[in-house]
C-alpha cells in the first residue's frame, strides 16, 4: 500500500479512540471461544460446526481485505469505524438469538468482515506517523485488549447465570456502545491506498502466517483448554477456568503490547516476529512434553508480542 504525503498525521488520540471501538466490538468474539465448545447443543450445532464457526471469521478476512482496502480508498476511517461497529453489534446479537449453523455462520462471517474493517481503521490512524507506528499499535492493542480481558474473566460467570445464548444478547447491547465512540473519530482521516486494485488478491505468505497463528493459538489452544477441563469437571467450571486462562493471555497482551511496540520501532518488527514465533513453537513443544504451565506461558507471551508486531511489520512492508 502506498500512502500519499498529503495525508494528515494524527496523534495518539484517534488511534486510542478507534482501539476503544474495537474493545467493545470484540466482546462477543472473545467469549464465544470459551462458551461455544462446551455448549454446542444449546446453540443447535455439533462439535464439528464449532470448529467451522470459530475459524470462519479468520478465513473470510484473508479473501476480503482486497475489497475492504478498495472501499477504504473512497470513504474515511470514521465511516468505516461506524460500519464496523454496526456489523459487530449485529453479529454479537445474532449469536444470542440464532439457533443452528446457518445463521451462526452468517454471524461469524459478519464479525470477520467487521473485525477486518476496524483493524484497518486502527491501522490507518496508527501508521499516519510511520516513525511511531509500532508504538501507536502497541498502545492501541493495550486498549483493544481491555474489553476481551474483562469479558473473559466475568463473562463465564454471567453465562452460567443467564444461559450460554442469552449472554450474547447482553453482550450485543454492550457492544452497541462502540457506535457512539466511532462517531467521535475525526470526520476526515488518512485513507489507505492500494498499489493494485485487485478485488481478491492472492494471499501472501505473511497472510498465511497470521492464519496459522490464529487457528493454532486462538483456535486449537483456546478450544483445547476448555474441552480438556470439561472432561474432568462441570461445564460451568470449564467456562470459568478456560475464561480465566484465556483472559490471562489478554491481560498479558495488554501489558506487553506497549513494550512490544516500542521495541518493534527500535529493533525492527521482523526480527522480533521471528523470535516470537520461535518462542511460540517452544511453548507448544513444552505443552506436548507435559510441561503445561511453562509451555502455556510461552504461548501466551509469544501470542501477545505477535499481536502487536504484525501491524507494524505490515506498515514496514508497505
Where are these regions (language model features)?
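Short amphipathic helix-loop junctions that connect adjacent transmembrane helices
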Residues: 34-48, 223-241
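Helix-to-loop junctions at the C-terminal end of transmembrane segments
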Residues: 64-76, 256-268
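Cytoplasmic helix-loop-helix junction between adjacent transmembrane helices
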Residues: 109-144
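C-terminal transmembrane helical hairpin of 12-TM major facilitator-type secondary transporters
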Residues: 270-310
Amino acid at each position: 500500500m502506498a500512502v500519499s504525503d498529503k495525508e494528515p498525521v494524527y496523534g495518539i488520540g484517534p488511534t486510542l479512540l478507534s482501539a476503544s471501538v474495537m474493545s467493545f466490538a470484540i466482546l462477543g468474539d472473545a467469549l464465544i471461544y470459551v462458551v461455544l465448545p462446551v455448549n454446542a447443543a444449546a446453540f443447535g450445532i455439533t462439535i464439528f460446526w464449532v470448529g467451522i464457526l470459530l475459524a470462519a471469521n479468520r478465513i473470510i478476512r484473508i479473501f476480503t481485505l482486497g475489497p475492504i482496502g478498495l472501499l477504504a480508498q473512497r470513504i474515511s476511517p470514521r465511516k468505516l469505524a461506524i460500519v464496523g461497529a454496526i456489523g459487530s453489534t449485529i453479529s454479537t446479537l445474532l449469536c444470542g438469538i440464532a439457533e443452528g449453523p446457518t445463521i451462526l455462520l452468517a454471524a461469524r462471517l459478519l464479525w470477520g468482515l467487521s473485525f477486518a474493517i476496524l483493524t484497518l481503521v486502527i491501522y490507518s490512524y496508527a501508521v499516519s506517523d510511520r516513525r511511531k507506528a509500532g508504538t501507536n499499535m502497541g498502545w492501541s492493542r493495550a486498549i483493544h485488549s481491555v474489553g476481551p480481558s474483562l469479558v473473559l474473566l466475568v463473562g463465564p460467570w454471567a453465562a452460567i447465570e443467564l444461559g450460554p445464548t442469552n449472554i450474547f444478547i447482553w453482550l450485543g447491547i454492550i457492544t452497541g456502545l462502540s457506535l457512539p465512540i466511532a462517531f467521535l473519530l475525526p470526520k476526515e482521516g488518512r485513507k489507505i491506498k492500494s498499489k493494485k486494485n485487485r478485488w481478491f488478491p492472492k494471499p501472501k505468505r505473511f497472510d498465511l502466517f497470521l492464519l496459522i497463528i490464529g487457528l493454532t493459538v486462538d483456535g486449537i489452544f483456546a478450544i483445547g483448554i476448555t474441552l480438556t477441563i470439561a472432561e474432568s469437571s462441570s461445564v460451568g467450571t470449564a467456562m470459568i477456568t478456560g475464561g480465566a486462562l484465556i483472559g490471562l493471555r489478554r491481560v498479558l497482551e495488554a501489558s506487553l503490547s506497549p513494550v512490544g511496540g516500542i521495541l518493534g520501532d527500535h529493533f525492527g518488527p521482523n526480527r522480533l516476529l521471528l523470535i516470537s514465533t520461535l518462542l511460540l513453537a517452544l511453548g507448544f513443544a513444552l505443552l506436548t512434553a507435559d510441561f503445561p504451565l511453562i509451555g502455556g506461558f510461552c504461548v501466551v507471551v509469544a501470542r501477545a508480542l505477535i499481536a502487536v508486531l504484525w501491524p507494524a511489520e505490515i506498515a514496514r512492508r508497505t
